[in-house]
Structures are given as structure tokens and as C-alpha cells.
Amino acid sequence: MDKNNNNNNSNGGHENLFKDLQNQKRVQNPSFSSGQSRTVPSISARGVAPISSSSSSSSISTTNNTTTTTTSGTGSTSSPVSKGVPLIPIGASRFKQQPSTDVWRSARGQQLSESLWSSFKQALQNSQNSQQSLSQSLSQSHSTNSEINNILLEFVKHYNSEYDKWNVEMGVDYANTKVYGIKLYCTPVLDIQTTLYLTRQLCSYVLNLSKALTDDNLDIPDGLHFICLINILSRSPLNSTLLHQENALAHPFQAARLASYKLSSFRDKNNPSFTKWWPYLKVLLANCCQIATNFVHDKQNLSFNSLRYGNVNNNNNSNNNNNIVNSTSLSSGSLLSNGGGISTSEPEISPSTSPLTGTTPTSPSSSWSSSSITNHQIQHQILMQQQQQQQAQQQHTQQYFNTIGQSSSYSYTNVINGVSTNNSTITATTTSNFLIQHIFKLGTISILMDSLQFFNDFFKTLQPKDSEDSFRLLIIDTLGILISGNGGLTTTTTTTTTTTTTTATSTNTTPNTIINNTTINNSGLTNSINNNNGGNNNLNKLKEPGNEIKTIINCIGMKAYIKTSKKVTSLQNEFQFQLHVIRVIKELISNNLNNAKYFNSHRGFEKIQEVILWVTQCFKPTDSHTFTDESCLDFDTSMPAQELSALLIGATSSNSSNNLPNLTNSISSPSHSSSSSSSTTTNINNSNNNTATATTTTSNVIIPPTMYDSLNSVLNSLKYTTYSEKSSSLIKSPPIIVKRSKVVQLSQLFQVLHSFSFTLVPFSKIQTNSSSSSGNLNYNIYSSSSASFINNNNNNNNCNISSPTNQSVNNNNNNNNNNNNNNNNNNNNNNNNVLPRSNSSYSIFRRGDSLNTIIDINQDNNNSNSNSNNSSTLDILNNSQDTIVDNNNGSNIDFEATITTNTTTVVTATVNLTNNNNNNNNNNNNMIDGNTEVTGGSAHNSWSSYTNINEQFQQLSLTSSTTATGSSPTSPTAFQYQSKPIDKMFVNTLLIETIFEKLFSQLNLSALNENHSTTSSLPISQNLSDDSSNTNTNNNNTSFGKIYISDNLQQNPNTDKSLSCGKIFNKIKNSTPELQLQIIEYLIKLVIENPYCLPILRRFNLWELIFSDNFYYSSPQATLNDDDIEYLLNSTTTTTTSSSTNISEEQLKKRKLYLFNGLRLGCLGLIQFFSTFNNRDNFEEICIILTEMRKSLLKSPASVIELCQLLINITKSNPQGTIQSLIKLRIFQQIPQMIQVLFKYEQASNSQFGLLHKKARNIIFSYLGQLIVHEELSYHAVVEKELIDVLFLLLRKVETKTFSITQIFFLMKLNVSSSSPSVTTLLSSSSQVLNSYQQQQQQPQQQSSQPQQQSSQPQQIPQSQLQQQNQTQSLQSSSLSSTSLLLTSQHQQPSTSLLSTSQFSSSSSLLQQQQQQQQQQQQQQQQQQQQQQQQQQQQPQLLQQTQQQQQQQQQQQQQQVQTPSSPQTLASLLGNSSSNTLTSSSSTLSLNESSTLSRLPTSNNLSELYRTYISELSMIKEETSCTYDFKFD
């Protein structure tokens, strides 16, 4: 602006300016009163003409400047209005704030702002010129100051017309509006002259305020508009820097400090002093909160309620009316209802997005909100637009410094952050972090903490309403923005060669203030200095140990005013506040072990549990279950949903599409084709068989034919058995949870908890019993939001991670020893068991787009005592794959990661997971960021100083990358900010324990009784008092169970008061399973975020919880006793009754069954997804499925069908991990045992199986057949004695004969190698048993031959009797050999079989029966000998021949047992004996020698086993005349 323009604005332009402002005030406050008439301009710009309005209750009429109102019930009349008074247009009541914003939506708002600011600067310049000339009198000086003050007041009112009252511009979401962006664009730029004037005025205001606060008789001083002016001007980054340099911010925060102490002194709401000061102090503190957040460059992105913000045009022509464009929403997602949240619609799943949120997964603690666009873009745009104006002001500022005697070298560009650059651009991140530290030194955190403590003390029983609630939300939002905004990476410590670093000194002359015997420094924080290392460790500590974290914790949890009878708006406001608090807690403790320790010691996780419970209790879906009711319209309730789903499993999609409920589509399994390597999602009921033609009708439900209806369809389906290729997609599709009306509040809560699940500190290291005296609430300058922490491998590192409990861990480390002597002298046995609960934790490396991570897995040799390791390299980030390593054997696993970034910075990381048997030596883990040096200190800080909480606790040591290859510490590339850095994260095990072991624990439910004052370690049973040391005092902050009981008794007076809280909690779970469904979605999102969470979830007994009565059930009645069921049926929750007043009981029942059926299918889908995720080992999942199958084998065949189909899907989708799990679990013992149980049950019932039992049996047969034909599993099946027993047992039954013969012949074709350990062991043991049995068999034969030798005359035996005798002897020898083999294999592994004892007893009884049969045969032989003596004379030669044949057969059998023969084919072993021939006229059973699978094992013992098979098959063939034709592809 030149001088002519300034003179016009100061002289002739003032009258027009004030007229415009007065007209604007009239528009902002339209009113009508008696004897007066106000003119309201018509809204012609909107196209709305002024018309007369009439109301149903009252009307306004004006005659001769008199206004009269006539009311007559529902009708009204009005007299004619005068011509000069226009009426308010219809609809104007909906735009109460619209007139004030209309000015800013056009170019007029910017013109008025520029005119007022120019007038203020001209008046200030004239005043200073007059003072220098000493020609102005005192009265003229006062009038000049009054004129300047009035101009500033009008300027503030132009930006905020109600600056002295609580208004919408003080809310947390105002910064996200378009008007805020427009005002930010029009913010003027300060200079030194203006800043000094404002500083003097603020100093006078603070002095007057301090007097008024100490004396209630004094009036409230004038000067609040100066605080508001600083709030408006500090929005510009240029103004913020200058305000800091001139110490203009100290006075506003001193006023806020005085205001917070005044709030702390209030004890009674009816006190006149409280009534006087409370509205004023709210506005003062709110402006100071906004001033503090203005120094955060990413304010909109960090705010939780960030939906959108205004955008401006880059047109610099201020005279153009179209230079300010009303922008649309720039939010990355859909608009969040109720002040933020997530959409209830199902998002589309793409490879680059999260399957639950629909957004790209990011770091859990990388942002304070869900907005994707930062305020830095607007600030950068403002900087570029004001660049020319800044350069024009530099010359004027330089002249001003020369006038007041300052050094000529001190220029405006020298003082911005102490950096002088060659260009005029300023890094917003650098400026923001530098200024935030200055805000911390002004005591902002202590002001916010005192304000929160005021709400905790003053609003114990009453909930804050309206402006009080908005003010409370603003305080916690400010705290979160400051802590999270302080985590940005900076480049202040390192500059390029083109920059020069200077020091901008600013002395703070404000003295210490002593109020209420408490010394308050100018800085509410103290900056810790690491004197040992000679650097700053950047730890900011609050003034009192532990009290601040306790104040924040007391803001959440169950409150006395939280009741189900409250309005939804009141509960929503309380929820939003507590959700903000949880996010602040996450930012505070996610990267600081001290804060985490005190959060746990003050029962922080129990408070989070209370939040989960009261949110589940109080909230319902916003649509009152409308979407759920629409989704369950086709849900059939005529029969149990589980039985219907089981009957439809295996049906073709074309036949079952019209009869299949919606929920049965929830479980998906990948179906793999032999010609395609990619996996596609199919239904669990998918089938490849279309042979079934009949349909079944059950309970008015048409059941289509399925592949498990008969064994013939099962055999046909085995032809199409295929398995997934190893090169297929590793990440399977997550299960689709039941479509329902979600509770938005619960979804938002678990979204925050998910971000809280990954931290930079190991929560397993927290020592709750530590007597640490440091005890301060510490928060890093570079928090978990943006910092990148990875381990340095300069030395051999050893990390002893404790178990996920609260037990203390002592690390005996030798800091002087830099060598890692990890000597393990113990032999580790490979037991193939479940992952042990060793003292280990999993460190997580986050993935980046441009990173290649190689993990070397060095596992100690189990059979060696040396230190040699077997290394294998796995590339886990190429091809977007995660390699998961499970410590199934409990041995040492060393993870060595080498990470290479785009900036050629190589950093290595080592974490050793050791057992208690290992020696823990020196642990030197140096946390290194490859981008910048964020803290000083030595690079040799030991890991023990990080894990041990003591007085010398030091935060993670972050040093500049000295191991970077190809870059120096001063190289720009070495400190370049990476968009997706790798963070070394730890899983928050205490949070998982809170959700799993405490929230759904039966012990927890039983402890919730009437004795609330007793001290207990359980979370809810403890009294939720403000003072954790005094748990016996009764106060208003009672436990969740007591509040719920009292609330329930008011609604149901007839309810027994002795009702336990266990029933109450069961009532919450059983009213609707929304909490369980949210936890399932939380677990899926947790594992997708990082697969390393799955072993930790297994360690916390995830599957025991999922399949327990606390979580997984098909109906609510399955988990409760009779008393609980009666109570639940007679009472309903408030949310259910309020939303279901017009819904019938049948619809309520259908909705409930629909949701719980979705919970059951969701649990099955969860275990299938985790079992196939990343093709990893799924031993525990397979084990729990088999356990549930055994439990449900007889009582619930529908569960058996679902679980067996689940096993089929998992085996086909993930054969790489499943096959090994099945081998460890000895699946060929498990399934035959189930078949034996079903076989005995069918015999004992003396009736045919029902439809479900038969289908359960058939699906088990189908799974067994699929396992037998598997290439690897078939060789384990051929040597499993229990499987062979069951297959020959099924031969005796006509219905299962075909299936059994098919499997037997397939096993007979296998080419088993005699070198395998299982076959060798079986052969050696069976030979010994056969020798013993042959010796026992020879004794009765010798006794029977003695009478024959004594007889002098030979007897003649008929030819038919001789043939029958030969067959009997051959069958006896073969049965003995088969029985000996069975006993041998049974004796080989007695501990692995679940039914080994019963089977051994059955085998011994079989031997006794055979001995009795032998005795009977001997008696028959003696009778035959008497008959033969009569015929000896007739046939002497025939008798001699038969005796010779018998002796020869016995000698051959003895030779076969003692000496093994060479490998032979089946035909050579069988010979030409007619009794053992497989080919006949009535049967086509044949085995070709030319077949590729016609060879037998290389042992006569196995040949004897197959001879037994052949003999039994021949006997069955003679009994039946059926024809079998088998074709093996």
C-alpha cells in the first residue's frame, strides 16, 4: 500500500468503513421491539424476495410504528404492515449465523479486513510520529489510543462478531470449515512495529486481570479482544514466528495461567464468584487453546473432528469478486456422522486398501485423525502468496531497526527460526516444531492439566452441557494436537551448505509467580539434559510425578451420570470426549516406557475396559436396526440355523441360491483350479459334484442335493480333489462379517484401540512393582506419530523379551562387555508341539514401498552343543510377502534384518528370542533413525537402560546415521524425510490381555458381586475411586456393575437385588453380539496390519476364548443356566425396548437369531482366515478344530459338518502349512477314532442314522479320502495301523464296503521305501513278534502229531476235507501275522493314540478267541483221526502225501519269518494259488503288474500283511456277487 491509499483510508474512508460495519452489526442481530422498527435487507443475492410471514401460533403486525401480536390457538390473523418495514423471509431462522458469513463468502470480507488493518497501521504510525515530535498533548494521546483500540475492536468483531461470548468459532471443528480457510487466507501480516504495540497492550491487560481475579469487587478488565486478536493473527506462520521472537505470547499464556488457577479455586457452582467469572474464563482459555494449536502446522489433520477445510484460489487480484471460491469437501473418506466416525456401509476390498476400513493401511500412530490433506498446503500457499509482500516489508523493517538503534545486520529474515536461507521459502515443519517447544515452555501443558482436573473435581455427578462440554472437548483436543504435532521430523540440527545457522536470542523477563504456595515457572516443562553424553535427550517432564497421567486417566471410564436413560446426544458428547482422551493417552505412552508404566499402575487399561462396557451398553445403531431387519427378512427360523447351514453344505450354488440364508455366505474359502495359480473366493457350501438329483424337504425347507448325501457322491467327488499351489496368493480374503446395523460409537472406539495396539515400547517390560522415583509424565519431542525407530547392529544384540504379563523382569546385563556370548549347552528336543509360552515378545518391522528387507534366521542345531548355526535367508518384502517364523521348538531364534532404503542408508537390526536356559549378556540396542539426528548422546546406550525403569532411565537413543553407505552426516540425502519409514513396533500385549482374558473371563464375572469395596486384582471389581490408595471409601465414581444394577432395578422393581453382575454382563453379551462382532473385526484388522500379531494372539489363548461359552455360541441359551435364561427372557435392555416399540416379538427373535448365527459363522470364518493367512503354520487352529469335532461328534452333528468342511477348505487353501500340522497331530489316528465312535454309536442305537448324522459321517469319509490320495500324506497312511483296522472294519458293512475297498486298493498300489524310519521300525518290531507267535503255535501242533505217530495204520482223508483244512491253516497263519503287526505298531507309539489302551485290550481278547478256536479245531481233528483210522487201510498213500505237504508249508513259514526275502511284486508274492487269486468270473478285481503303482514294500512282513488283505477280500468276494470297477487317474 502506498501513502495515498493510506491517507484515503485514514481520512475519507473511515466514515464509509464504520457505516459498513454498523450495517453489518444490524444484519447480525435483527430484532423487533415495541416502538421501534428495524430494517432488514432483503436477500436478493439468494433470489429470495421479502414476503409476509404467518405462524400457526403467533403473528406479527405493525401499524403506525406499533407492533401487535394476536394468538388464537392453531390459527392466527395479522393486520397489514407498513410500507417501509420489510419482513423476515421464510427460512431465515435456519441461517442464524448466515449474515455474518455472507460477508466472507464474497470479496467484501477481504476488502473490509484490509481496510481495517490499513487504518490501524496508519493510526499507529501517526501516533508514533506525534510522540516523537512531542507536540501532542496528553488528551490527544489518549484519544489517539482510544481510536486505535476501537479500530482493533472492530477488526476483531469483523472476524468474530461474538468474540466475548462462547460461540461456534471456539469449537474443535471450526478449523475444518470453509469460512476458516477464507479468513486464514485474508489474515494480515504483522511487522515489528505492530507487534511491539500489541505486546505493550497485553502486558497492561494481564496486570489488570491479576488484580481483578484476586478482588471480586473489581470489574472484569477490558482487553479480551487483544487475546482474540493474537488468536486471529497467529494463524499465519509468518505472524507466529514474529510473535515468538518479540515475546508477545508470554502475556496471553500468563493470563491463561491465572485463569486456570482461578478455576481450581472454585468449589461451589452457586458461588457468585463462579457465576461472574466462569463464562469469561471459558472464552479466555478457549482463545489460548486456539493460539497454542495455531503453532502446529498440521492442525486440521491432527484434529479428531477434521472433516474438511476451506480452499482458496491462487488469484492475487483482490478486486475480483470471484477470487475466493467455495471449495468442496477435501476429506479422503465419507463424512463422519456425530462428529467423526466410520461409515456403516461395507467398503470395497482392493489389494491396496484395508478390507475393513476401505483405506490404505498406515502406521497405527501416524496421525491424529483420518484426514489425508494437511494444513501445511494452505500455509505453504499463503507463504507463496505473501512472499512479495514480505520482501517489500523487509526494507521498511530494516529502516525501523536503524531508527531505534538496533544493529543494521539484524533483519527480518535473520530471526525466522534462526536460519537464513538463500531463498524466501520457509520449511513449515521446522518452524512448527521450533515454535511448539516455545509453547511448551510457556506452561501450556500445565494449564490444560489444571483445566482437566477442574472438570474431574467439579463435574463428578453432573455432566457438562452445551458450552461446558464444548470447552472440555477443546481442552483435550488441544492437548492431543500439541503432543501429536510435536512428533514431526525436523531438519533443524542439520543444514545444507547453502544455509547458515544463527542463534536468535529472546530473553524472557517475566518473573516467577507464586500462587497458592506453588512455584510456577514460565515453563511448565523442564528440558532434561543428558549430562553423561553431553547432549539433550529431549525428554519433557511435567511438574509432578504421576499426577498428570492420573488426571488424564480419570477423565475416562464409567461416570455416575452415564446411564442408559440419558439422551443419545448427552451420551454422544461424553463418548466423543472420552475417545479424545484415549487418543491422547495413546500418543503419550506409545513411545515412552515411563508413561506406560504409570498408565498401567493407575489402572488405565481397566478404565479402557470400562469404556468398552458402557459404550456397548448405552449405544445402539443409529438406524435402530433397520438395516439388520431388512437383511434378515429371508432368514428362516423354522429350524435351527446351524442345522440348516449344515444341511446346505456341499450343495451346488445353482440349486442352493434360493434356499440358502444370507449368513451362510459369510464363510469363504479359496477354490483352486489345477490350471490357475490364483485363488478365488468361493462359498463354504461350494461343490464340484453335480450328481445328486433328489431334493429333501425338512421343516418346510427344501434342501437341495449335496455331495455328502451318499457315499457314492463322496467317491465321485474324490476324483476332483486338488490343492492350492505354493505360488498362489499368500494373503487370503478376510471373512465377510454379517451384514448388520453397526454401532458407530463402538466401531470408532475399536478403531482407536487398533492404533493403540502397536507401540514403540514393549508393554511386556512394564514393572508395576518398581520403586522408581523419576515418575514423571514424559513425552518425546519426536513421538510415535512420525519417528522411525530401527535397531542398529553395530554390536551383537540380545533382547530378552518378557512374557505378556505384568511380572517384573530382571535383566542381568554387562554393559562393559561388547561381545555376545550366547552359549546354549542344552539339547533342545523337537517335540512338534504347540508354540510354547516362552518369555518372548515379537518385534514388528513395518513395511515400506521401497524397502528390501532380508531376514536371516539362525536356529541352533538341536543335536549339537556347539555355537554353529544353520542360516537361511528369506526375502519377506519382495513380492509383497511376509515370512512368519514360529518358535515351535522353543529354541533360540536370532532375527537379523538388513534394511536398505532409497537413500542408500543401510541399517541392520537384531533381536534374539531366547529361553530361560540361555545366558543373557550384553544388550546394546541403539535405536537409529536414518533420516535425522533427533537426540544427542552416545551411540552405546545399552538396552538395559531402556528396559529397566530406574532413576537413570533414558529414552530411546536416536543418533544420526553413521553407518550410511555413500552419504555423509551432512549430506542432504542422509536426512531426507521418508514418506513411509520403517518403525520398529511392539504389540501392546496388555491391551490384548484386557480385551481377551479380562473382558471375557468367567473369573471376572464371578468377582462382580455386591462387595464393591473389597480390594481385588480384577479390573471391574475394584472401586473406581479417584484415589487408588483408598479403595474402601464410598464415592460417586462407582463401578460399572453397581451402576448397571441400580439402573436395572429402577426399570424392573421386581428384580431380585442379589442379582450378580455376571448375569448383567451376560445380559449385555446376549442382548446383541455387537461387541463380539467388533472384536472379530478388530482381530482381522490387527493381523492384516502385521502378521506377527497372530503368534501373540495364540499365546493369549485366542481360540479357547473364541470357542468358549463366553464368546462363541450358536444361541444365547447355550451358555446360561435356567435362572439366567429366565431373567434374560423377562427383561430387555433400554436400547432394545426403545428401538423396538413397533416391532413384533417374532421380528425381535429373528433379528437375534440372525445376529448370533452371524457370530457363529464369523468365528468360523476367522479361524479359516488365520489358518490360511500367508500360508503359515496353523497347528493350533487345526488342533482346536479337531478338538471341537470330537466334542460335538455325537451331540451336535451339524457342528461336525461345519468344522469338517472348514478343515477341507483350510487343507486345500493352505496345504503347505496344513499338511505338516496334520502329520504332527497324527490325523490318521484322529479320524479313524471318530469313525469307530460313530460305528459303535450306530450299532448301539439299533436304528439308522438321521440325516445330519449320516451327512456328518459322509463328510468325514470324504475328508479321509482326500487325505489318503494326497501325495505326501498317503505314505503316512499306509503304515498307520489304526487306519487299516478301520478300513477293514468298514469292509464288513455293506453300505461302506465300496468306500473301504477303494481306499485299500489305493494304498496297495503305493511304492513304500523300506529305508523310511517308520517302515523300518515297523518291520523290525513285527519280525520279533512273529517269531514269538510262531513258537507258541508249534507247541500244540507237536502235541497233535504225537497220536498220529503212535497209530500203526494210516488213515485216508477225503480230498474235500484236506482242502478245507489247508484253507483253515492258511487263514490262521495270516490272521496271526496281521494281529502281530497290529500289536507291534500299537506298541510302537502308545502315547500318541487317544484310544491305545482300549485297542490293546481288544487285540488281546482277539488272541484269546483265536486260541479257543484252535482248541476246538484240535478236538475236531481228534475226532477226524478216529474216523481216519478206519480209512487208513483204504488210502495209505494219500495220507502220506498230505502229511508231507503240511510239513513243507510249516518249514516255508519258518524260513519266511527268520530270513527276509528280496523285493517282489504282488503277483510273485501271491503265486498261482487259486485261493488267493483276485480275478474270477464274478468279480473284476485285478491288479496288473504293468501298473505304475503295482509294487509292494520291500519286505515279506508287509507282504504277509497284504496277503491278509487279499484273503479277507477273497472271502468277501465269495460272499457277494457284486462287481467292482475302479479306475485310478
Curated annotation (Swiss-Prot):
GO terms for biological process: positive regulation of transcription by RNA polymerase II. It comes from the Eukaryota. This is Putative uncharacterized protein DDB_G0281251. Residues 24-42, 834-843, 1016-1027 have a biased composition (Polar residues). Residues 1-85, 335-371, 660-694, 798-843, 1016-1035, 1334-1364, 1454-1497 are annotated as: Disordered. Residues 1-11, 51-79, 810-833, 1454-1494 have a biased composition (Low complexity). GO terms for cellular component: mediator complex. GO terms for molecular function: transcription coactivator activity. It comes from Dictyostelium discoideum (Social amoeba).
